[in-house]
Each structure stands twice: as C-alpha cells, then as structure tokens.
Amino acid sequence: MKNFLPLLIIGLLFFGCISPSTPSIPLHLTNASLPATNSSQIQTINTTTTSIPVNSSNSSGISNVSSTNNNTSPTSQNTSAPVLIQLIIPASIESNCIGFLVGDSTELQNIPIAGGAWARPHPGPFAWGFIEKTPGIYDFSETDAWVISAQQSNVALLATIWPFADWDQTCKQNCEVDSSDQFYPKTKGGFTGGIPAKRCAPCNMTAYEHFIATLVERYDGDGVNDLPGLKLPINYYEILNEPAMDDKTLTFFKGTNMDYLELLKSSYEAIKSTCANCKIVQGGAAGIDFKFLSFWETFYSSGGSQYVDIANIHYIGNGDRDTLNVKKFKQTINNYGVNKPIWVTEAQYSSKDSITSSFEGSLDAGASRVFFVSFKIGEMNPPVFGEYSLEYQSLAAKCK
C-alpha cells in the first residue's frame, strides 16, 4: 500500500484528473501596427476584451473599408485583454504657441528652426474627394506622407478638412467655383493639388461622416487602425477655411452660415465619436469686416459654439494690427456667451516693424496660438530651407 499511493497520483496526472496550476500569462499588444513610443507620449493604457475589426490596408495607405469582416474576431482565441497605448502630443509641443502655414511637406523642417512647433498645411491634403476618389476606397498615401514628415520634424499638425467630393456633389446646383479660383484643382505629375472644385455641403452626410471618422481613426494614435509607425498623432482639426469668403477668385464654401453650422455639427460629432480628446477648430474668420463678423454673429447666436472647441480669427494685413484682430473677435463672440480659446491661424505681415508687439498684443487679448503665413516676413515666395526672419526666434519665449 505504501508503494501504491505514488503510482496512483502519477496515473491521475497522466489521465488529466489532476492538473498542475497554470502560470499567469502577461498581456500582449495585439495590434500589429502599434508603434513604439516613449514615456512622453503615453497618456493612458486601456484594456478591452471585445474584438476590434481591422480594415484591410497596406503600406501604400490604400484601404478598402467594404472588405472588413465583422464576423472575424482577431482576439476571439485570446482570453487575455489587449493593451492599447494612447499617443499624445508631447507637452513641449503643446506649450509652444507658434505655428506656420505650409504649402508643401518639405517646408515642415523649417518650423523648429524658426522657433515653432505647429504646422497648418494649406490647403493641405485632407480633402474628402482626393482621399476617397471612389466611394468606399480610401487612398491615404498623400496624408500619410505629410504625417510622417511632420513627426520627423517633431511638428504637430492642424489638419484642415475639406468636406468636398465631386462624386457626392449631385444634389445642388452651382456648386463649382470659378476656374480662376486660387485653389481650383490642378493635376501635375499624377498629383492633384488645390481643393475639389465643387464646394457645397455634402449631399450624402452619412458618407462624409464615415470618411471623416476613418481619417481621424488613422491618425488619432489609439493603437486601432492607426498609420503604421505613427508617433505623433493629429488631435486638432479645422473644418473648412474662411467659409464666409465669397469672391470670384477665392471661395472656400458655397453655402450659408446655417449650412456651415450643420456641416460643423456633423463633423464635430463624427470626430468626437472616434477621438473624444480631439479638438475641433472653427473655420477661420477672414477678418473683422462687417460682412465677416455678421456671418459669425449669426453662427454663434444660433448655437454654433457647442460644436466648436477653439474659435479662430485671421489677420491678413487688415483690421486691428495691435491684437491681430483678436480683441474685436473675442468681444463679438463674448456677446453671445461664447468663451472659447482663440487661435489666429493666419497672421500676415508686410514688414517687420510690429511683429513682436502685435504678437504679444494678440496673446494679451486672448489668443493662445498664432500661425504665421510666411517664414520670411513680407515675402510669399516658397521658403528656402534654413531661411526665416530672425524676429520669430524670440517669440516662443513669450508663449503663455
């Protein structure tokens, strides 16, 4: 009997009646595209046990959303919860209040040299019809190139969304701008620049909302369907530019202020549903002339502020130079109970005389970020790498 007990235990183990304890298994990252990050970019770690369908995509940036199989569960065979790391814009960039308009991604490398940390591509690559040329198929190759170039220069992007696709603009007439428009689309070397020619509000708002949610998801840095290698997310989106501008050679939007409010509402809700911490910037007010301010008075008196995180004013050499139009614009929106952060996303100077005083005046009046139109004050020529006005270098120290 003394020799029988060990044999009995061995037999039970062999037939599976008793199983040794299983060591705990550590959590693993399950999204193959999740990039390496450093501690300055980690904000939160979220865990989930639900499966996440992943759109089919490849390194070329082309994604066919219709090929997603929602019945396939990438994590269904794994009982451990995946860890998703949320990328954020580092504090060193967030605290910098200097940005520049750039027309080409090669200009991004000039921004840190000049003392800035932000870029507003203009008109930029974030146009619905240029990304989704065919309904349901997205080509992110151009936007990917911008994002990669920006993070290589350690520059954060303010992306301007152009909610226009020619194939969608079928429900209204007279949507196409004049061919003399400064941003009429032109194709060169296989690349189309400018802005889609038809510029009414989307006809199929559901399709537009799907586009913008897909775009935001690719660059939000949450580890789900992100651009492979993403390190610096896009957290700020401007919906259109100067929607009140209506000129033969410069029209950004064919619609009323109420049309813009509805468009902004749809954009805001689609972005927030995908990226709750993303911020929506109002399309820039073109100045403080009566026709521009009246557009925004109606917009804000009709409840537009609930779909805006950041208000936006421009100074293009006209108006109040001392505050870059911030003082008057702030007073105007305050009249309707609106108290939002204010950015100046276009500041243009003809000379160097007042750049420091007016920049400080804009901050004192309530601006929290200023984007300059050119690297060399008074010049609008394409910039040369390393060339900029020295006056810019001292401005970053004045950020509040």
Predicted region positions:
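Secretory targeting signatures
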Residues: 1-36
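Active-site cleft segment of glycoside hydrolase catalytic domains centered on the general acid/base Glu
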Residues: 173-308, 314-336, 350-360, 380-385
